[in-house]
Structure formats: C-alpha cells, structure tokens
C-alpha cells in the first residue's frame, strides 16, 4: 500500500438475501451483531408513508407493504433490463421493476406519498449504509473504509456497480474481493491457529441466498492462490423457496380453486412460510406450513416432507456439481487431491446438498468448522485490516485471486481473440499487436468482450472505443498495440496505441449498458445524504415523543403510588392526573409533530408538575424515581429530558 489508510476498515459481505459485517479488533475478527442482536441483517429496504426501513424492520413488515419493500437488488445490479435472467427474476417480485436510461433496471416505489425510482446500486447502497451504521454503533466512531465482497463469478459491470454502491454510501471501497476467496481466508486463519503449515488444496463450495460459487485454492504458509473459479450468479436458497412456493400454489389451486399469485400480500406470506419450512427441513424430516386467512379468509395448513422438498429441487441440487467439475478440470487437480471441502453460505445446510457433495468426493467428510453465514464477512474484515495497514502477525497473508471469465476483443469475422484467459491471476496486464483489415483504413474499432465462446456474438460486450488518425497504409502494415489491464478489484482497463504515430486511446470498461456515470453517482450520493438526514430527523422526533410519553406516565405513576397516598393532597393529585391525561391525548391526536413541539410540551408538563413533586421531595416522600426533573439544582430544564429507556437488543 502506498499510503496508510486513515481510521478503521470493515469487511462487508453484501449478500442477496442477508448481509454481514466484521472488523479486525484486538488481534481477532469481530462479526458484529445488529440492533436486534442478529449477526446477519436482511438485505431489504422498505419505503412507507412516514419512513425508510432497512434490514430486519424492513423484512418484518414485507407482508403488509409488499409493493414498496425491495429485496434481491443483487440479482439486478450491473445487469441489463433485457437480460433474460432479469426478466425471469422480476416476474415474482411484488415491487415494480422498470427499464430506465436505455437498458438499466430500476425499482419504482411509493415513499412519503411520492413515486420514487431507485437504481439497484442505490438500494444496495442503503443496505451498505445499514452495515456501516451497525459497525459504527459497535465501534463508537465513524467508519469510512471497507472491503466489499462479490460472487467470484460476477462480471466486470456487476463488480463496478457494487463499487459504485459503496461510493454512494460514502465509503472508500479499498477492494472488491470474491466471496469464496474471503471464506478461504477465514478457513486459512482457522487452520493456522491449529498449526497446519503444509500446502493444502481447498475447494470452497459457496451456496448462498441468490448466488453459487466454487473456487479451488492452494494455501501454503499464508499464500492463498486461487487456481480456478466457476459458478452461477443465479442460483441459491431463493430458488429453492420458489420451488416450494410453486408447489403450494398449485396444491392450493387444486384444493380451493383459488390462485394465491393474484394477491401480492398472500404470495409474500406464503413465501415467508416456505422459507421457514425449508430451514426446518434441514434439521427435521417433516414440517407444516400454517397460514391463517391466506386468501379470501381460507386458513391454509399443509405438511411437507424433506423427501418431497428434495424431489422439487433435485435438478437444482444436482446442477451444483457442474461448477465443481469445472474447477477441478481447469486447475488440473483431481478430486482425490483435495484436502478439504469447505461449506459456505446458508444453503449448504441443506442435507441433500451436503450428501451429493460427499458422494461426489467419494465419501469425504466436509469441513464445517467455519460459520457458513459469517465466513465471508470474516475474511473481508481480515483483508480490510491488511489493506488499512494493520501489521498483526496473525494475518500475514498474501491473496492471489483470478479473473473468472476470459477477456478479449473482436477481430475480423466476429472472432473472439482472447488476451486474458479465465482463471488468470490478477492483477494482470497483457499486450498484443493488431493491424488494419483494409487498405488505407483510417481507424479501428476496439470492441471488448468477456466469455468463453469462440464468436463474440455469443459473449458479453463490455464496451468499445475507436482509435482514429491512422496514416494511410496497406492492410496489415499499421501496428496497433492493445493492452488489457485488470486491477486487484477485477476491473478492466483497455488501451490501444498506434506505434507509428504514438496516438492512443483508452477505456475503463464503464459498460455503457450497466454502469452509472460520475454525475449519476454524485447525484445518488447527495440523495443518500438527504435520506439519511431525514431518517435521523425522524429518529430524533420519535425520541422526543417517547421522552414526553415516558415522563407523563412516570409522573402519573408517582402520584398514584400507594406509599404517597397520605402525603399528596387530593387536589394536587387530581390536577396532575388531568394534566397527564391532556398530554397523552395530545400525543395520540398529534402523531406527527416536529421534535421541538414535543420538547415544548414536555417543558410545559415539567413546569406544571415540578412545584407538586418538589413539595413531596421536601417532605422526603418521593422514592428514587430515575431521571426526574424537579427544577431543584438544575441549570437547564432541557439538561434532563425525562426518563430514558434502553432498547433491548
């Protein structure tokens, strides 16, 4: 690192369904729990008439507000709207996905009575903001730096879009790293503490909520070298949920002649029940789905066995072996040479997935000594600390990752000429000389593609640019040097120069189809700040409202205290009761006032109650009542805002 990073750096596993954050502290990784006490947080953002919710609170209200609760942004990020996978995904989404700016997906929601449109990067940035806040509340200070993980099989535009999401949140993204590689760090450090030093071939099998990756690494003396990677950015636990949902939808239709899919709220409730059933079936062999008044007042009760669930998903489960075979083939390592098969991602808890893997590796025991939900964030936290300049001996490691897809350009006849083969260690730089196809050709169009097919039309175009001003010459004479340069984030820069004139042009693959422009990112940063300020304002308002309510109840409880029956005059008691009743009615009828108005009301109540409470104090009659303001020895009424209550995590 050329310059040491200011402040602490965190590692964020930005998942399709759940996210997780960790930090290196006191020579170890802390995976941080959120305000609900959970170490993973749903990647959900909800918009209501009054507020924006992120995480558990958003997921908990999804059945009540399906149209405006956004999830699965990771399945949209960096993709084209017309991408068949995106079209397939949006079908069951209860929220609206629209096409914006050419061919980019965006979500449309109602927020505070207005229609708002958000890019997937913005939704992801809100989840990242939540993870950042979880870390800040644990560390007690602001966090600016982060390492964010992506599936190993994410392409260039998906990586770039994830980096943009970090920028919108106001994070300095030190590095984008691959999820299985991050998990391998967690595995490697665990092995290190158990004293293993010899070279190990490790297969990371990472099946999460929405993506699937397999990576094969060799680990020796702190060097983590990725040999090959493969996967499916479109397979995970949600696909298994969908199979259950489809099964119960058809069962319900058969039994009651009603279509659950016609009602977004009913469908959401069914999906939540199916997700719960799937989890239960990982430990039990049978479970029931029970939903009161699912649709048209019909209570739905149905049982499902593990065997039936396995049958419904068997093709998906079996499909997980293909990437495993591919990495073994690409790395030229046989399955008998694999020392450990490491399970990562919540979906690896499914017994059938484990059994198929055991069978594939001829009965080999699977490595389960790292937490599948937390391993990725754990590894990201270690990498963040290293990049921030932490020199702890415990994490003396070097990471050698690879580019997941072949990269090249189009040459005559639509041929894909590969400059960087898949599974090349990154960062890397490759240069090749090309020439013109026609006599006196004044310029060349450089079209950059990624993929494994021999024709560019079957691969994914990343971007294009022109190199013009080539002096007239017969075909094949000009020498055009093209350089592909991949940085440590897996993001590609391409440059071309004419050797005779020295004229050059370059492009950072900003993927005109999927990437946000600098101006768009700046606008989104401003909007993110605005939403954050609104959230904070609402929090302060609720705090003032709760403070007033608590104070009113405490005053009333005090004058009703049996012990004070003899001490307090009946007319004082009556006047306090009336005043408190008036205040509580005021709160009930004024749900949405400004913070200052609630504070003013509390001040008014204190001024009213203080003389009476002071009398009781002077008689020595008042028991210890927490944060009471009596006006005595107090410089400022606002210095004591009534009783505070701690939220229990």
From Swiss-Prot:
Organism lineage string: Eukaryota, Cryptophyceae, Pyrenomonadales, Pyrenomonadaceae, Pyrenomonas
Organism: Pyrenomonas salina
Alphabetized UniProt keyword annotations: ATP-binding, Nucleotide-binding, Stress response
Residues covered by region (Disordered): 620-649
Polar residues biased stretches: 620-633
GO MF assignments: ATP binding; ATP-dependent protein folding chaperone
InterPro entries assigned to the protein according to its UniProt record, in alphabetical order: ATPase_NBD, Heat_shock_70_CS, HSP70_C_sf, HSP70_peptide-bd_sf, Hsp_70_fam
PROSITE patterns (UniProt xref): HSP70_1 (PS00297), HSP70_2 (PS00329), HSP70_3 (PS01036)
Record's protein name: Heat shock 70 kDa protein
Pfam families: HSP70
Protein family per UniProt: Belongs to the heat shock protein 70 family.
